Amino acid sequence: GVRYSEAGEALEKFCAEFNIPFAETQSGKTACLSSDKYNLGGLGVTGNSAGNVMAKDADVVIGIGTRFSDFTTASKSLFKDDVKMVTINTSRFDAYKLDAVKMVADAKLGILALGDELRKANYKSAYTTEIADAKADWDKEMEILANYNYDENFKPLIAARDEKTIPEYVEKIGGVITQTAALAMIRKLIPADALCTGAAGSLP
């Protein structure tokens, strides 16, 4: 919804003004700068630790233009039991999900309207170092993953697995670079203004 509404800049300004972190769904990628101070990255089973840790501890979650899919919400297990949900969505059906306080509206207009109300209430979140800490922890993890290769020191991240799978995979591809290391390398090497198109038949 943020991408279709071209509301990326409005969302970034909203989050900066009220000290609110945000995470992205796969469909929402490119709507906001990944380098934005408040952008935690992905969310849910296809997300990262920064987005998921902050979402798990949140008292209020604002879903903007999202369908709250199982990937995004970790099959509805990501949030606290008593979390308060707020939705902004042009689809009334999706706005009503998770027993949310709903705003059936365009994402950009909804963000601006919500900002007006928060401004009247002199609202600012109570976060101090939590956002930066979560991002720093993820950066450390990403550095480990970026250097995670099929070498003599390789140890699988998931112990419960078929022991033949990884050796067979390495033999077939004929290389030592893991998917995460390859993606990290691409991210470092591509120009800042590059356009990327991707598709996958399974989890990354």
Regions of interest found by a model, annotated:
Residues 8-19, 76-81, 102, 119:
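Short, solvent-exposed amphipathic alpha-helical segments in soluble enzyme
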Residues 86-197:
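Phosphate/pyrophosphate-binding active-site segments
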Residues 44-96:
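Phosphate/diphosphate-binding loops
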Residues 1, 25-27, 66, 88-90, ...:
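Cofactor-binding loop segments of dinucleotide-utilizing enzymes, especially the Rossmann-like FAD-
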Residues 28-33, 69-70, 92-96, 111, ...:
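Short gly/pro/ser/thr-enriched loop/turn and capping motifs at secondary-structure boundaries
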Residues 1-58, 188-204:
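Anionic-ligand anchoring segments at beta-strand to alpha-helix junctions in alpha/beta enzyme folds, i.e.
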Residues 39-43, 80-81, 103-105:
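Short, hinge-like loop/turn segments at secondary-structure boundaries
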Residues 6-8, 33-34, 71-74, 97, ...:
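Short glycine-/acidic-enriched loop or helix-start segments at secondary-structure transitions
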